[in-house]
Amino acid sequence: METTLGEIARIIKGELKGNHNIKIKGISTPENPKENTVVFCRNMEEVEKAKEKASAVVTQEEVKDFPHIKVKDVKLALAEFLEHFFPEEHPWGFLRTPASEKELEIGMGSFIGDFVVIGKNVKIGRNVKIYPFTYVGDNTVIGDNTVIFSGVHIYRNTVIGRNVRIHSGAVIGADGFGYHITQEGIKKIPHIGGVIIEDNVEIGANTTIDRALIENTLIGKNTKIDNLVMVAHNCKVGENNILVSQVGLSGSVKTGKNVILAGQVGVADHVEIGDNVIVTAKSGVANNLAPNKTYGANLPAIEWSRWKRIYVYLLRLPELFKKITT
């Protein structure tokens, strides 16, 4: 994209403070601002980060001596910006072109099974195996020696490294769960980012890894992900992680190196987990976890009649505590 700050202000119905003719060539994030881009900021801390490189910001605040567009609702403005400048494209008509007849880059020794559908501008390395009924979206890159089993769905703008194994039913790069509640209803926030899966990663059956809002959801090298794991948009999973079945990572979670999340661990959005952390099964992680420790908070099953008695006492704890302290 290439536009002006004035045109952006018109599209998102904001109040422009600065030169209308500033050239804008894209969007970036407060964490990673880039030159010639606009950044949508939720607070002044993000504004200060964005000012280091970005050409302008969109914010609810007044910003001194820096080009900005002032809006009432930053999330709504972001959704309107993405809808206008990055519209979702869909084909029309009947497309029956087999993968073998498309202009693809396919390395020596690779195999593409029956009923595989491959989009445009896809690059496939050497000795890659793609089994039947798999979908590979536009602008995807697949590294050498990677194996993709039957029925995998890989959305556009996905980068898969070397020696990766993706099992049946996995979905890579679906839209992140991003919505904003307005007076008119629930507004979808378009996701224009992608997914990067580094070398030597294994992804289990029916696992889902969502695309990022603007940049990339990342799975670090040598990480192993079990079946039925959910990785939400903007997550950064570190190297050598183990994510056991039914783990759920909310949006923008970051994990360090050598992290182990046991079965059914749930992690709240924007939480950071340090290196060498182990979280025991069924634990909920609501806050950042310091490195080199084991964490856990779960309730193992006990005899039902006993639990009901304990529960009665739990409800009386505030009353009992008050009696003890007075």
Curated annotation (Swiss-Prot):
Keywords: Acyltransferase, Lipid A biosynthesis, Lipid biosynthesis, Lipid metabolism, Repeat, Transferase. CDD domains: LbH_LpxD. It catalyses: a UDP-3-O-[(3R)-3-hydroxyacyl]-alpha-D-glucosamine + a (3R)-hydroxyacyl-[ACP] = a UDP-2-N,3-O-bis[(3R)-3-hydroxyacyl]-alpha-D-glucosamine + holo-[ACP] + H(+). It comes from the Bacteria. The keyword Acyltransferase applies. One of its GO terms (molecular function) is N-acyltransferase activity. GO terms for biological process: lipid A biosynthetic process. One of its GO terms (cellular component) is membrane. The active site is at H233 (proton acceptor). Pfam families: Hexapep. HAMAP family: LpxD (MF_00523). Catalyzes the N-acylation of UDP-3-O-acylglucosamine using 3-hydroxyacyl-ACP as the acyl donor. Is involved in the biosynthesis of lipid A, a phosphorylated glycolipid that anchors the lipopolysaccharide to the outer membrane of the cell. Belongs to the transferase hexapeptide repeat family. LpxD subfamily. NCBIfam families: lipid_A_lpxD, PRK00892.1. This is UDP-3-O-acylglucosamine N-acyltransferase. It comes from Aquifex aeolicus (strain VF5). The gene is lpxD.
